[in-house]
Amino acid sequence: MYVSQQLRRLHILLVDNDTHIRDKVQQALGNGFILRSARSLDEAWHALEEYSPDVLICEMLLPDAGGVDLCRLVRRSPALQHVPIMILTTLSTLQDKIAGFEAGADDYVVKPFDARHLIARIRLLSRIKRLEYDRG
């Protein structure tokens, strides 16, 4: 079972209103991941109602709300609270990071990002989620 989970392509939901960033993340992830994207909190919530991704990646600055708002919504949802959340943003102050973690984010990556680092962080979040699930 562990091997099949390792070989399965991870499902990622990326929430960012910047087309350039969405394209860059798609290019960075390549074929090893299934990427779905949303441009706003509203689009993200509709996507999350349809499926539960392996990892949710969101920008702090969204056109209709903040990434912290999305984090809070996900953490309050019994169906989604298990989904690991990574914030991927240009906001880099300690206060921004603390706000993200307090809202429920599991990881915080500052743009610009290195593709290998992003992939490593996504895989780590997925592995932690899997270990928590296996422990019951």
Feature annotation, model-predicted:
Residues 18-37:
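Two-component/phosphorelay signaling modules centered on CheY-like receiver
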Residues 1-13, 17, 126-129, 133-136:
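Non-catalytic signal-transmission and effector/linker regions of two-component phosphorelay proteins
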Residues 37-55:
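Acidic, metal-coordinating helix/loop segments flanking the phosphotransfer/catalytic sites
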Residues 59, 89:
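Active-site residues of response regulator receiver
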Residues 22, 62-63, 81, 93, ...:
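The feature encodes the CheY-like receiver
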Residues 113-126:
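C-terminal output helix
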